[in-house]
């Protein structure tokens, strides 16, 4: 199908939703097949304009009296409001599926996905079997920010309803973290994309198999990082352990140090559908997603 078909289908779906809900509409996704996902607001005249991630979530998280609920910044599943759970549910393809949740303050949030698989190098893959349905799996999403041992850490995470998660992080995962940190710290080259590694089917918590997918890059000609191997290892262990211990089963942690070095670490439970398309898991961009630091992590250090 051409991108024009997806665009027409997209706006046609929105038109139907407006006719039914007569509410302010916020949505996530791409405008058409092949375009990057984003956050959007649709006006009464059907015009769509981009909004920031913070504005998107704060708006749809408003209570009936227009205030952000106290629990809005809580990451734990037991405390997170149902609003966040509802609006982050993903449909497989907006030409076939569309989820609408009518919230208590008359704001409708639509979450869509173009069923686009992204390879490690950022290229788009569209295999025939990609038309999967994820709208029963994603339970909640959060964006968090903190600093550990001098390393800036941000994470974009999802809790999948069908995946199992425990609260024990064992040395098995730590050994793999140490491997890729040593590779990231000591590797160097003359290209901006510094490489990637995959550690599949790591069974570290006694209940669930897990996999790690990591890639690093630099805005300088060298891929070296000035942070010590020990500090980076501690930052990764603390952040991943904290996310796992809060029940996250598919998440990406972005690490940055200085003005040039970046790393993305995707951690995926084997029961999560994202395990089949790990490089499609969203990662926060260091310079763009400016959510305030909250309690998403255990105590930050450094």
Swiss-Prot record:
Signal sequence extent: 1-23
Keywords: Glycoprotein, Signal
Pfam families linked: DUF6736
Coiled-coil zones: none
Keyword presence, Transmembrane: no
Residues with attached carbohydrate: 65, 86, 93, 220, 231
Entry GO CC: endoplasmic reticulum; mitochondrion
InterPro entries on file: CSS2_C (IPR046624)
Family in the record: To yeast killer toxin KHR.
Name the record gives this protein: Putative uncharacterized protein YER076C
Organism, scientific name: Saccharomyces cerevisiae (strain ATCC 204508 / S288c)
